[in-house]
Regions:
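C-terminal helix-rich "cap/oligomerization" subdomain common to oxidoreductases
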Residues: 1-9, 19-24, 36-63, 78-81, ...
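A contiguous active-site-proximal alpha/beta segment in oxidoreductase catalytic domains
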Residues: 4-8, 36, 61-65, 70-128
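Short, aromatic/basic amphipathic alpha-helical patches
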Residues: 13-25, 77-83, 108, 135-139
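A general structural signal for well-ordered alpha-helical segments in protein cores
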Residues: 15, 77, 103-104, 138-139, ...
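Structural alpha-beta junctions
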Residues: 20-30, 59-63, 83-92, 115, ...
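Hydrophobic alpha-helical segments that drive targeting, anchoring, or assembly
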Residues: 40-53, 65-72, 141, 183, ...
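Rossmann-like dinucleotide-binding domain that binds NAD(P)(H)
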Residues: 120-193
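NAD(P)-dinucleotide binding in Rossmann-like oxidoreductases
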Residues: 172-235, 239, 245, 249
Length: 264
């Protein structure tokens, strides 16, 4: 049975973003009526977002969507994971790159092909609050691709953040550049006789990203998914609430990624 859910944005600044997504969601999602409490809250992923999400759950929210989650206290994220599981609440991360619907659709296929590569290069263009936030975006994409990434170096050059590390036996290098033109994230995974080229849009639209796999037989473009990151997160939250299966493990992995970057 599909549960009817009322949804609301944490702050007026998110209302437009929520409204655009609500228009594409199933009718079981309804906008919050004046004076009524919301079943699911959309919370901005800046500042102390984990603490605010915990407060929302304490106030009775059955689900929370975090929009573009960034750096915050790792301990606060772990507290949120524990509280969500205790309350039976669902927390979904709407991540601009790691949550890309086309990437997630082809997750298993990409992991299989990445096993034959030895180097992962990542470049990112867009605004970021801090160098650590830029590094976090890249780390999260690597983990979304099933890569056990460990960063060893991070430094800031002119208008850019550079990170280096390893993903198992693979070498990893990423660079994030601040800018408004050509926003997105590009991943090139190189190996003997095999190449992956992924171009993730990261603009919040339903326009699909471009994912391609090349080997000795030629290049293959993976089928696109015409869906926004936000809509995909809302649908995952709804499905998890229907199943009654809250899972704090994704939050614990996010906390581990944050802690790794903070330790550099």
């Amino acid at each position: 049975m599909t549960l009817p859910l009322t949804i609301a944005a944490e702050a007026p600044g998110l209302a437009q973003r929520l409204g655009k997504t609500l228009a594409t969601l199933p009718l079981s999602y309804r906008a919050q009526e004046k004076g009524a409490s919301a079943s699911v809250m959309l919370i901005a992923g800046d500042g102390d977002w984990a603490a605010r999400a915990t407060t929302a759950i304490d106030a009775g929210a059955r689900g929370v969507i975090i929009a573009d989650p960034g750096m915050t206290g790792a301990d606060a994220i772990l507290t949120l994971a524990d509280r969500a599981e205790q309350a039976g609440a669902v927390v979904e991360l709407a991540e601009r790159y790691a949550g890309d619907p086309t990437l997630l659709r082809h997750h298993a296929d990409l992991i299989q092909h990445l096993a034959a590569t030895s180097t992962i290069l990542m470049s990112q263009v867009g605004d970021f609050a801090t160098p650590a936030d830029a590094a976090l975006d890249m780390v999260r994409t690597a983990h979304a691709l099933g890569q056990p990434l460990t960063l060893t170096h991070m430094w800031q050059a002119s208008h850019a953040v550079v990170v280096r590390g390893t993903a198992g036996e693979k070498l990893f290098e990423g660079m994030a550049t601040s800018g408004s033109g050509g926003v997105g994230q590009r991943i090139d995974a190189l190996g003997f006789g095999r190449t992956l080229r992924l171009a993730l849009r990261g603009d919040g639209s339903a326009s699909p990203s471009d994912l391609r796999i090349a080997n000795a037989k030629g290049e293959r473009k993976l089928s696109p998914v015409y869906e926004s990151v936000d809509r995909a997160a809302w649908l995952r939250a709804h499905a998890a609430l229907d199943r009654g299966e809250p899972d704090g493990q994704p939050l614990r992995q996010f906390a581990a990624d944050v802690a790794m970057i903070q330790a550099l």
